[in-house]
């Protein structure tokens, strides 16, 4: 037998023996380290010739490949995490999305979303791209999301990070964790004020206002509503001399329905939100708010 053939047989024999030395315990250990499936772990260990670090790299590469192949998939499920600082001056909403409700309700997925949001809260990060470069478990959050995508086979994304600041920031998350609200008040440090803030947050969740007050509405929206009002008046056969007046009346109705402070309070329609807040504490009002819904 020639030396080349002998060497080839020697290498084949030792390679096969090495692969056979990958035990179920090894596979389970890698699974515990990475959370990947048993077969994926076995294949990665075999490809890495039993090297755990290399196997982890292989699995992460697989995750990146899966993520890339799913880049065009819709991620319309997930959770909203709402957090506020201890002094109630800073709040955030983190929207972490997936593809199915099954994954969205998974405890591990929820824990990952909360961990990501907590990093943003602890460092007062208000920019999504900055947050994605923060580290979690030795890798960036962006890499962690890719890794988790590979693990579960669904596209996982940090879709939005929204923050507000104020004297008293109150948060609300709807029971299904798919809708979150932040309200920034101009007063804080009072149980009554906090309770009122919670009521306002629930109002925002239910009524979805477009702005805090009339002056905060986008001018293009106002222009559109006036034109709609005029067209409706003309279609109803109203005289041209009163078309403008009718349109302005419809605009005021738009403000009542769609601006937070002018909306009727859902718990007591006899007052609007501005009046309700003023009853709780003289001069109490809303500085800003944020509303985030999964997939919206």
Predicted regions and their residues:
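N-terminal assembly/interaction segments in proteins that build large macromolecular machines
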Residues: 18-296
